Amino acid sequence: MNDEDYSTIYDTIQNERTYEVPDQPEENESPHYDDVHEYLRPENDLYATQLNTHEYDFVSVYTIKGEETSLASVQSEDRGYLLPDEIYSELQEAHPGEPQEDRGISMEGLYSSTQDQQLCAAELQENGSVMKEDLPSPSSFTIQHSKAFSTTKYSCYSDAEGLEEKEGAHMNPEIYLFVKAGIDGESIGNCPFSQRLFMILWLKGVVFNVTTVDLKRKPADLHNLAPGTHPPFLTFNGDVKTDVNKIEEFLEETLTPEKYPKLAAKHRESNTAGIDIFSKFSAYIKNTKQQNNAALERGLTKALKKLDDYLNTPLPEEIDANTCGEDKGSRRKFLDGDELTLADCNLLPKLHVVKIVAKKYRNYDIPAEMTGLWRYLKNAYARDEFTNTCAADSEIELAYADVAKRLSRS
């Protein structure tokens, strides 16, 4: 996608962007705030976790200034990450022993629709519940609790970059990502746009800090940094950036090979796959009239089926002149191939919300016959970059408690 395409998209969303206040002054040009900077030292707070990727149980162990505590929680019963039995067995046969790799591939730029951003911003509430803080190896994390911000901080170091980053820290950018906090004021809250940026930075393999912001306390320092702006936003070497789409473009243009992988799309169609799902979901979940429910549900199912068709259609590089019959379907893991890309960072957080909320408030399940979509979800839930940036299911459900409307015959 060329610069002219970017400009057109940005012009369209500039006046409607719910998370951004234009012409933000760039304050606090230092890498971070003086009152919390001392907490960034790794020796202060350490974070270690264990994650079973099959059951999605987790145990978090904190060592904070010499005091050790543990937290265990089981979420497998309500996450619903596993596929229907018949699909799961089919996919295991189709993909025996496939490795899960943590690299990005060349893609074109990806942008979510303005409508999705408006709908999501209107629906994300500040209520929720404690999220799992299972940020696992191969990355190492530093946790900080800042009294000034009422936040939790995670410093992420990619294994491949860890030693190099420490030896040449002055040559690397200082990145601080600010995301919405959960109901406890510290864990990661429900916000697909926050998760989108979190995933991008993780996939890039860059060293970065994540600060969860408790909006209920409205910390003064946050207002000074980005007045009138709600998370997500980030600082890059002291410069404040508040527009999610522009942040994505900036990171892709700045964090480049050979050091950082490209994540932009090869196929334009991958960028728009599933683009109308969230708007169909929003209309469905907000509806209060029983007589309209069936039609709105069909609309959501139709949008999901369109995505399923795209995922089952081979990409040009998958087509082999010698293949025939049933083997012509795609077996790729993600939208644009076998690697997570910017397109996935945009779609997967929203798709996860749709899956959780539609089941909770409308008892709606993604149809089992959508094998391409279930394959996509299965592969996504096997990746730490996705599962460990998700809010807890209960957090998402509570965020929509006031949005999902009860059906009535009136």
Curated annotation (Swiss-Prot):
Protein name per its UniProtKB record: Chloride intracellular channel protein 5
Keywords linked to the UniProt accession: Cell membrane, Cell projection, Chloride, Chloride channel, Cytoplasm, Cytoskeleton, Deafness, Golgi apparatus, Hearing, Ion channel, Ion transport, Membrane, Mitochondrion, Non-syndromic deafness, Oxidoreductase, Sensory transduction, Transmembrane, Transmembrane helix, Transport, Vision, Voltage-gated channel
Single Gene Ontology BP annotation: chloride transport
Quaternary context: Component of a multimeric complex consisting of several cytoskeletal proteins, including actin, ezrin, alpha-actinin, gelsolin, and IQGAP1. Interacts with AKAP9. Interacts with TPRN. TPRN, CLIC5 and PTPQR form concentric rings at the base of stereocilia and may form a complex. Interacts with EZR, MYO6 and RDX; the proteins may work together as a complex to stabilize linkages between the plasma membrane and subjacent actin cytoskeleton at the stereocilium base.
Motif residue range(s): G-site: 191-194
Alphabetical list of PANTHER family matching this protein: CHLORIDE INTRACELLULAR CHANNEL PROTEIN 5, CHLORIDE INTRACELLULAR CHANNEL PROTEIN 6-RELATED
Cellular-component GO terms for this entry: actin cytoskeleton; apical plasma membrane; cell cortex; centrosome; chloride channel complex; extracellular exosome; Golgi apparatus; mitochondrion
Database matches in InterPro entries: CLIC (IPR002946), CLIC5_C_GST (IPR042069), CLIC_N (IPR053823), Glutathione-S-Trfase_C-like (IPR010987), Glutathione-S-Trfase_C_sf (IPR036282), Glutathione_S-Trfase (IPR040079), Thioredoxin-like_sf (IPR036249)
Organism of derivation: Homo sapiens
Stretches that traverse the bilayer: 193-213
Tissue: Widely expressed in both fetal and adult human tissues. Isoform 1 is expressed in renal glomeruli endothelial cells and podocytes (at protein level).
Family: Belongs to the chloride channel CLIC family.
Superkingdom of origin: Eukaryota
Entry's EC annotation: 1.8.-.-
GO MF annotation terms: chloride channel activity; oxidoreductase activity
Domain-level remarks: The active G-site contains a monothiol Cys-X-X-Ser motif which mediates glutathione-dependent redox catalysis. Members of this family may change from a globular, soluble state to a state where the N-terminal domain is inserted into the membrane and functions as a chloride channel. The redox status of the active cysteine in Cys-X-X-Cys/Ser motif likely determines the capacity to adopt a soluble or membrane-inserted state. A conformation change of the N-terminal domain is thought to expose hydrophobic surfaces that trigger membrane insertion.
Task performed by this protein: In the soluble state, catalyzes glutaredoxin-like thiol disulfide exchange reactions with reduced glutathione as electron donor. Can insert into membranes and form non-selective ion channels almost equally permeable to Na(+), K(+) and Cl(-). Required for normal hearing. It is necessary for the formation of stereocilia in the inner ear and normal development of the organ of Corti. May play a role in the regulation of transepithelial ion absorption and secretion. Is required for the development and/or maintenance of the proper glomerular endothelial cell and podocyte architecture.
Disease tied to this entry: Deafness, autosomal recessive, 103: A form of sensorineural deafness with onset in early childhood. Hearing impairment progresses from mild to severe or even profound before the second decade, and is accompanied by vestibular areflexia.
Keyword Transmembrane: yes
Residue span(s) of domain GST C-terminal: 260-400
Regulation: Inhibited by F-actin.
One Pfam entry name: CLIC-like_N
